């Protein structure tokens, strides 16, 4: 029941347009293949605007680690007193690659429930982390390093993951 409520919160957050992070590619543009450096879309997960939007929604400011880029994976950590949440974006170069990577994460991270209305496909995994597919990008909000409730008012780790994913997707959609 709690997971169903959390999934509803994610959908509500998207519907309310909680984030306003910069500009994103329009839905009319074709996906771009992975390049030598991270795309603007990927860099958004660690950008000041997204950090501020996530802090507002979660109710806690995070110290964000320096972003890394390796093997077409862009990531950074959001450090809270309760631990670290890692946001990462895997850039791929085709639909088949994207679907295969998404499906592999579902298997290796132990998908427990789909998330409707988030990206072009999304799911929650065993520890409450969230995976979202949007075009040729896969967002992972990894909360395995968070312990206990986060923010003010306090939110469960699952809620924090869904809220962070919703903020990033709103940034990507240009809302």
Question: What do these predicted ranges mean?
Answer:
Residues 28-83, 169-172:
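Extracytoplasmic low-complexity, Pro/Thr/Ser/Ala/Gly-rich segments
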Residues 7, 17-33:
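Bacterial lipoprotein signal-peptidase II cleavage site
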Residues 42, 48, 53, 85, ...:
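Subset-of-secretome marker
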Residues 1-9:
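Bacterial N-terminal signal peptides that target proteins for export
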Residues 61-117, 121, 125, 134:
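Short, solvent-exposed recognition patches
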Residues 12-13:
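Repetitive helical segments and hydrophobic/amphipathic motifs
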Residues 113-175:
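A short, solvent-exposed beta-edge/loop patch
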Residues 56, 100, 104-107, 163, ...:
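Charged/polar, solvent-exposed surface patches and flexible loops
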């Amino acid at each position: 029941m709690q997971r169903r409520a959390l999934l509803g919160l994610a959908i509500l957050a998207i519907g309310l347009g909680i984030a306003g992070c910069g500009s994103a590619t329009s839905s009319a543009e074709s996906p771009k293949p992975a390049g030598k450096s991270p795309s603007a879309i990927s860099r958004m997960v660690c950008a000041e605007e997204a950090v501020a939007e996530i802090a507002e929604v979660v109710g806690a400011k995070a110290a964000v680690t320096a972003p890394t880029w390796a093997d077409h994976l862009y990531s950074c950590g959001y450090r809270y007193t309760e631990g670290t949440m890692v946001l990462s974006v895997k850039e791929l170069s085709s639909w088949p690659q994207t679907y295969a990577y998404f499906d592999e994460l579902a298997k290796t991270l132990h998908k427990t429930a789909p998330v409707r209305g988030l990206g072009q496909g999304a799911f929650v995994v065993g520890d409450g982390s969230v995976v979202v597919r949007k075009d040729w990008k896969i967002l992972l909000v990894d909360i395995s390093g968070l312990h206990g409730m986060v923010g003010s008012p306090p939110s469960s780790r699952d809620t924090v993951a869904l809220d962070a994913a919703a903020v990033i997707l709103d940034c990507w959609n240009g809302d």
